[in-house]
Amino acid sequence: SDPKIGDGCFGLPLDHIGSVSGLGCNRPVQNRPKK
């Protein structure tokens, strides 16, 4: 769970989910790690 792939911790758009909030900060809640 790298905080640079798609955790949304930094407000980055998760893979193709589209969540830009700190919801899955190192926590695969709804933004499960694609890799």
Curated annotation (Swiss-Prot):
GO terms for molecular function: hormone activity; toxin activity. Keywords: Disulfide bond, Hypotensive agent, Secreted, Toxin, Vasoactive, Vasodilator. Expressed by the venom gland. It holds the Pfam family ANP. InterPro entries: Natr_peptide, Natr_peptide_CS. Disulfide bonds join 9-25. Its main location: secreted. It is found in: Secreted. The lineage of its organism: Eukaryota, Metazoa, Chordata, Craniata, Vertebrata. This is Natriuretic peptide TNP-b. GO terms for biological process: regulation of blood pressure; vasodilation. The keyword Signal does not apply. Negative results: does not activate natriuretic peptide receptor-A (NPR1). It comes from the Eukaryota. GO terms for cellular component: extracellular region. Belongs to the natriuretic peptide family. Snake venom natriuretic peptide that exhibits vasoactive and probable hypotensive activity. Is only weakly active on natriuretic peptide receptor-C (NPR3).
